[in-house]
Amino acid sequence: MKFLIDECLHTSLVQVAQASGYVADHVNYLSLGGLKDWQLLPVIREREYTFVTNNGADFLALFGKEPLHPGIIIIVPNVTPILQRELFKAALGHIGARDLTNCVVEVKYVGDRTVCSQYAFPESTE
């Protein structure tokens, strides 16, 4: 699994993923910063990135139109880079060896706990 980190999140999340044994890129490192959300989708699709963002609403709308996608991780609260790293580490721990195809993982704080939830997206109509 490889991750593409959105420009709304800190570049240090790349190192968090790499330290956990994953391949990761940041939108800014690929000179994709400033592109519209829909302009990132072909890159995500072609390179089979699991996308990591804080911009859940916009990307859920885009991914909801995709019949197949490699997954999306949403860091729900808008927090400092230190807390982004903590939440992303929790998401990586949750994922483990799971296949995230057509899945969303949301990670957030609930009180003093970190909570990860995973669901199919778009929902299967079968």
Residue ranges and their predicted role:
Residues 59-92:
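Mid-chain, well-packed structural core segment of small domains
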Residues 40-42, 84-93, 120-121:
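Short, surface-exposed amphipathic charged segments that create phosphate/polyanion-binding patches used
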Residues 26, 73-76, 106:
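Structural signal for conserved beta-strand scaffold positions within catalytic alpha/beta enzyme cores
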Residues 2-50:
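N-terminal first-folded block
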Residues 7, 53-57, 77:
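Short secondary-structure boundary segments
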Residues 95-126:
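Charged phosphate-binding loop/patch that engages nucleotide di/tri-phosphates or the phosphate backbone
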Residues 45-62:
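Acidic, metal-binding active-site segment of PIN/NYN-like and related structure-specific nucleases
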Residues 32-34, 79-82, 112-113:
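A short acidic, often aromatic-flanked loop/helix-cap motif at beta-alpha or helix-coil junctions
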